[in-house]
Amino acid sequence: MTMMDTDEGKTVMCLLTDPEGTHLGSAMYIPQKAGPLQLTQLVNRFLDNEEMLPYSFYVSDEELLVPVGTYLEKNKVSVEKVLTIVYQQQAVFRIRPVNRCSQTIAGHAEAVLCVSFSPDGKQLASGSGDTTVRLWDLYTETPLFTCKGHKNWVLTVAWSPDGKHLVSGSKSGEICCWNPKKGELEGSPLTGHKKWITGISWEPVHLSSPCRRFVTSSKDGDARIWDITLKKSIICLSGHTLAVTCVKWGGDGIIYTGSQDCTIKMWETTQGKLIRELKGHGHWINSLALSTEYVLRTGAFDHTGRQYPPNEEKQKALERYNKTKGDSPERLVSGSDDFTMFLWEPSVSKQPKKRLTGHQQLVNHVYFSPDGKWIASASFDKSVRLWNGITGQFVTVFRGHVGPVYQVSWSADSRLLLSGSKDSTLKIWEIRTKKLKQDLPGHADEVFAVDWSPDGEKVVSGGKDRVLKLWKG
């Protein structure tokens, strides 16, 4: 780093880059007293933004919250090289941290195994060991419908990204499609899988609107594509030699499946042909996540809550997808029983971009932040780890849970992370300070499932004590 004295005091040679590493102009001298505000003005000027947009700045994955000179002194940075500062556009809205339980809702007769907010954040679905799916009214925080149709535990629920359908999968292998406005079964349960359903993922709305197709993964070793209008399985994706544990339908139209056979397979969706295999894990794959997952889940719905007519929905969803994805390829992260994770750019290479090590026990759940900048991982080693979502570099470890961590979820602005654990608590972690923001005790037993509403207003949790808890800021 070169420093020199000028009329306005000391300056530093800096290079501004976006999170993908694209330079914003060439290296330049900036005053040492410049902090985030001055850098924000500089970036807005360079990008010719019509209005001032908010940015955050990072040096070596640490957020720059002080003037550059103060950072140099504190970190004793060598004065021989250029300082690289990464700029990242912030969400223009802020999510309040939740800090209190607003409602405890009884209703399920057995453990709550899965929970999911609708893409617009207005409705909530839960699945239970009592074989029912329940829909809840978030305004009154009371039960809306009890959906009966399964004969066994409901292991997973998934909303279509246009919010018009809800699909659930059970331990017996059948799939139920529900009309969430009425709580009624749309036709008979769909059969085809021989063993329990491990995951459900919808075709993104920017590829097909209105939503019709979804994919399921099962312990029977297959994944199946279903058409909700035809009410049947249209393609069976066969090739894994053991249980398929997770599935994601990517924004480029490719389906990813993770399996106990230690491989990830990529499928095209017109005929169900295998495109590529991603290998590297030494044990079962438990979880897959995509860098674009939040926009795939929410489709045309954004934080403003605006509703779009069906003919505009596809275009709006595509705009949101392209904005999140940027110029870089969609990224995939996998978490495994071998204690490790891999970061992939599957459209570019079948070799992993990075191996993410550090967990001392199996990795149960992995999840990208809505802006794609971070990856969070939950493990049986009682910790949550945070990684750079672009490079895969380790950032920090969140310790505080005293039991295995089952699931994580992000706030819509990517500033807060939620975790649920066997220790009966939820915890909210702040990404900026890398510290615990809020401890949320209240459940009487293990917390199996958590979700943060896409509009950021509420958190839901469910588990062994059979109740749903809603949390607010």
Swiss-Prot record:
Gene3D superfamilies membership: YVTN repeat-like/Quinoprotein amine dehydrogenase
Tissue: Constitutively and ubiquitously expressed.
Position of sequence motif DWD box: 417-432
Location in or out of the cell: Nucleus, Nucleolus
Pfam families: NLE, WD40
A Gene Ontology biological process term: embryo sac development
Alphabetized InterPro entries for the sequence: G-protein_beta_WD-40_rep, Gprotein_B, NLE, WD40/YVTN_repeat-like_dom_sf, WD40_repeat_CS, WD40_repeat_dom_sf, WD40_rpt
Main location as per UniProt: nucleus
This protein's UniProt keywords: Nucleus, Repeat, WD repeat
Residues covered by region (Ubiquitin-like (UBL) domain): 9-91
WD repeats: 107-146, 149-188, 192-236, 239-277, 313-354, 358-399, 400-439, 442-473
Deleted gene: phenotype: Female semisterility due to strongly delayed development of female gametophyte.
GO cellular component: Cul4-RING E3 ubiquitin ligase complex; nucleolus
Subunit composition and interactions: Associates with the pre-60S ribosomal particle.
Physiological role: Required for female gametophyte development.
Domain notes: The DWD box is required for interaction with DDB1A.
Protein name: Notchless protein homolog
Organism encoding this protein: Arabidopsis thaliana (Mouse-ear cress)
